[in-house]
Regions:
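N-terminal leader/capping segments at the start of a protein or of a new domain
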Residues: 1-21
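Acidic, metal-coordinating catalytic segment for phosphate/diphosphate chemistry
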Residues: 14-54
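Short, well-ordered loop/turn elements at secondary-structure boundaries
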Residues: 51, 61-62
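Conserved Nudix-box catalytic region and its N-terminal flanking loop in Nudix hydrolases
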Residues: 62-96
Length: 97
């Protein structure tokens, strides 16, 4: 199985195994699964429902966190970014870090 298909299948399995905390998470889970299963371009930011990542980074004591300035929103934010054609979202998150 090619890398993109393998990463997509792994992501689908991980999200299917996710237990939503509330109704909103249940809805979000279905939206994400629908995009992953039906849109071959869901890893491109041009897709209406596209994949992106976020990382919440803390130090070993959990007392400090790493944030970045978000120019569009003019505020501090956790780190993240669009997949831009990469289905391995862990790799995308690490790229942003």
């Amino acid at each position: 199985m090619e890398t993109m298909a393998r990463d997509r299948a792994r992501l689908i399995a991980d999200i299917e195994a996710f237990e939503p905390f509330n109704e909103q998470e249940s809805v979000d889970k279905q939206v994400i699964l629908r995009a992953l299963k039906s849109d071959p371009n869901c890893f491109e930011r041009s897709a209406q429902a596209h994949m992106a990542t976020s990382i919440w980074t803390v130090d070993a004591s959990f007392e400090r966190t790493l944030l970045e300035w978000h120019n569009i929103y003019q505020s501090w934010s956790w780190i993240g970014g669009h997949a831009d054609g990469v289905a391995d979202l862990r790799a995308v998150a690490l790229r942003e870090l």
